[in-house]
Amino acid sequence: MAQAVWSRLGRILWLSCLLPWAPAGVAAGLYELNLTTDSPATTGAEVTISASLVAKDNGSLALPADAHLYRFHWIHTPLVLTGKAEKGLSSTIRVVGHVPGEFPVSVWVTASDCWMCQPVARGFVVLHITEFLVGDLVVTQNTSLPWPSSYLTKTILKVSFLLHDPSDFLKTALFLYSWDFGDGTQMVTEDSVVYYNYSIIGTFTVKLKVVAEWEEVKPDATKAVMQKTGDFSASLKLQETLRGIQVLGPTLIQTFQKMTLTLNFLGSPPLTVCWRLKPECLPLEEGECHPVSVASTAYNLTHTFRDPGDYCFSIRAENIISKTHQYHRIQVWPSRIQPAVFAFPCATLITVMLAFIMYMTLRNATQQKDMVENPEPPSGVRCCCQMCCGPFLLETPSEYLEIVRENHGLLPPLYKSVKTYTV
């Protein structure tokens, strides 16, 4: 293999040295090559590469009428050439790769009578050869959702495996398919197409393992069972359409009373919710309200009404699949608690002020009365002692009464004198 690579490099270097000495009569730079290939391919399968000579200015330049004036040159080592065909101004080759890897294939066009002349056009393509099966896992559903990899729950999905084998290398092989749908369901089939229905929302990965077996005749005329495998997967996002919005909340409320509505969405999040109060139940127009992102299937909406009247909550919700509208009527009555709320503090304040005024008035009146009844307040310790402690310091009650009469001369005598007559 190393010798073949060095041989190819030597040939390219040799051509690069000879090209500058080629005549310039050929229309170099006016044409280009369009290359197509059916790569990637599995090892042992044929790969087709085609090259077509076209004008660079998208067709305004006329192509040569005689196709025999030009010749195509290919370099495809270490790939094995299995076929070559030329028709008009195009050339096609078929090659086979027996080891996996990335392999460049080069092609250029020269005048047919001067293959060492400067190329009219050149190009190259890289072939991808793998030891595994080549194919695609395709998921389809009878819906027209504009979002890639998004599908509906409770709707049949068609999952297909499309084998990429343009050379029919595996036309005699038997295939076995092992499916894993990512929700715990697994199955093994001999058919490359299955139908499945997801009942829950979420993101799932469908995994498929393909095994191909066939018989191959060896050079010694013996038969051997050959096998190739391949692993494929596809990511699916299962969504639910919004079937409606359930609104839980009062339909009658008073002003200045906080109201809470609970919105239950019958669909899969994430959602975009928008609402607005209107006199009538009419759908919301675009840009009429501010959208709110909701990551669950429930949302609480709060509002306080200041004016009585009839209102309607216009609610709109949407996810990446669908949208829906809902309405909720509510009547707002004037609040009965509102006057009492303002009157009670005022009445309390007035009552406190009146009580304080009455207290101060009675206090001043009591002080003035005491001053009138006692114009000359007693002085010294003697008066205080006589008034307060007299009954305890005097020996007899008669002495206490005499002292009282001295201090209160205006009081009448406590008893009248008794006269005694002797006959």
UniProtKB/Swiss-Prot annotation:
Residues 25-339 are extracellular. Residues 1-24 form the signal peptide. CDD domains: PKD (cd00146). It is found in: Golgi apparatus membrane. Residues 361-423 are cytoplasmic. It comes from the Eukaryota. InterPro entries: Ig-like_fold, PKAT, PKAT_KLD, PKD_dom, PKD_dom_sf. One of its GO terms (cellular component) is Golgi membrane. The chain crosses the membrane at residues 340-360. The keyword Membrane applies. The keyword Zinc does not apply. This is Transmembrane protein 130. The lineage of its organism: Eukaryota, Metazoa, Chordata, Craniata, Vertebrata.
